[in-house]
Curated annotation (Swiss-Prot):
Effect seen on changing W143A: Minor effect on growth, no growth, and no growth on solid agar with Fe-coprogen, Fe-rhodotorulic acid, and ferrioxamine B as the sole iron source, respectively
Induction: For induction, the TonB and the ExbB proteins have to be active. Induced by hydroxyurea.
Extent of the signal sequence: 1-36
GO annotations of cellular component type: cell outer membrane; membrane; transmembrane transporter complex
One GO process term, biological-process aspect: siderophore-dependent iron import into cell
Biased composition (Polar residues): 60-72
Protein name in UniProt: Hydroxamate siderophore receptor FhuE
Topological type in the membrane: Multi-pass membrane protein
Amino acid sequence: MLSTQFNRDNQYQAITKPSLLAGCIALALLPSAAFAAPATEETVIVEGSATAPDDGENDYSVTSTSAGTKMQMTQRDIPQSVTIVSQQRMEDQQLQTLGEVMENTLGISKSQADSDRALYYSRGFQIDNYMVDGIPTYFESRWNLGDALSDMALFERVEVVRGATGLMTGTGNPSAAINMVRKHATSREFKGDVSAEYGSWNKERYVADLQSPLTEDGKIRARIVGGYQNNDSWLDRYNSEKTFFSGIVDADLGDLTTLSAGYEYQRIDVNSPTWGGLPRWNTDGSSNSYDRARSTAPDWAYNDKEINKVFMTLKQQFADTWQATLNATHSEVEFDSKMMYVDAYVNKADGMLVGPYSNYGPGFDYVGGTGWNSGKRKVDALDLFADGSYELFGRQHNLMFGGSYSKQNNRYFSSWANIFPDEIGSFYNFNGNFPQTDWSPQSLAQDDTTHMKSLYAATRVTLADPLHLILGARYTNWRVDTLTYSMEKNHTTPYAGLVFDINDNWSTYASYTSIFQPQNDRDSSGKYLAPITGNNYELGLKSDWMNSRLTTTLAIFRIEQDNVAQSTGTPIPGSNGETAYKAVDGTVSKGVEFELNGAITDNWQLTFGATRYIAEDNEGNAVNPNLPRTTVKMFTSYRLPVMPELTVGGGVNWQNRVYTDTVTPYGTFRAEQGSYALVDLFTRYQVTKNFSLQGNVNNLFDKTYDTNVEGSIVYGTPRNFSITGTYQF
């Protein structure tokens, strides 16, 4: 098989050696792969910049990335576990939101709070760092601003770095950092595609992606991506309408200078969303089960979100091998919602609801509530850094250094009212026909501003031809001002990684970084928990083949933390349902991950991964047992050599048993979801050179499963279908 190799000197070199690993996998898993087109003796040289993000538009892998260190490298050179979800995989698997991407990414698990809110975890800890083009946004789970609903039509790929990522983000849990890479205007000719999709629950989706030069020489280019989606749901009364748009201009201002500037808009309007799930427990300790269509949302409930972002990137090359990059962004995310939740136990005799605080006395027998919440999150961020190579002791090395500043303001308002048993009546007869609250004026619920200033640097030193050392550090000044208190912290996060090249295809690595994470969680008295501190260690083995078209990673990790927030399962007294947490010291998460991703042959793409970890506190108690300790995820596509117009594929996601023990007035109950697998299928037929039809089936066997054993019952998505027509020009 012909390919090129991205080497350690940031150059592309032609190679004609076939991939032994790819051949072995192909022969073992699919004998027909042996009949793929044979290699020829002709050498093909691919010219391109070392910063080219992708060497195959139809691959599940990419050639190089700056994830983890901001230095452009192959994944094999990064001493951490990295997963990249490419545009082709998102199209094959119909991963249309950030949440859907994370659900199908190795090592990431989900806890679904209701119809639209979900928390995502890796290695046992919540993911709280979400970046766009390397600029982070921090969000709180209490407020639903639609982060996981970001539409992937606007993005080229998603990069996931697992473990602590303090060198990139300054603060954060040792879970993972998610970076969404925007689409850019890369074509000097007019090109594009339009698609229409129709599916289960009256889904309709239309997307256009167009590129065009704005000048005759193509040095100024534009790209517009726009779309509209409307769908109902398996949940009664639910409807979602989404509009999204991105416009970007990329300009070559000279031979050494490029400028990108753009605007992003997303609007998501949801009618009758749920706020929490269905009551799990009866008063006798038995658990409930419901039809998956059952919803606690009344007809008048809604949750509307609007996202506006402007952004720019300026790049300047200098001194032959150096480049300075300035990223800037301003984003505003607004939401407005009126919803209803039920938090109660069911009396099996008559279906009447009993509140969790009924034994506190009169006035405490409420069984839920209604809330009118609104607010805005504003983020202003700048990031300036330079990276390049230098020579020392006769060897080439790499250096990156820079600084960043971000200001994030969260300002939210709320009005709420309690619901009492007689207002609902028997829950067995509840159908969402509930009168809208006579709302009181909203009051200020939260107003806080977080400032973060950082200086960072890292160098990749070639100690010997096969041995590379990465050293780095990030100094962070973090300050938050809230309605009730102010806090300022200074922290330096060290980073060290060692990579040893075993041969042309295999490397082994070790890495270390510290952990620093201020927390927004509060204890039962309403006080904020102290920052999380700790250490992250990782050892691994990586390989890449065919110019990184196929990559593998085997990683062993150990995470040590103090002051980790763990849910108590009860709300903070006097709060609007906010869960109380306790700080747990001596928390250790340790485990192993394996991933294979990319092209097995020119016709066969495969991503396969498995994760196993254990997370315990210093007393041996499981931390977050509501998260699966073992997961396996696989997705593949295969283009038939005998009928190259036809591509078939599918995948499976499996997780082991999860549970949560909940203390109630009636005793301690255990909520449990056994292990289960979800199977998906897809096929695509290239009808003409420009037009294709694709069909997808998700949850093929219509598995019923609970996505949130930590709280009320929230069922996962039932079996669903879609068909998509795409025209390229």
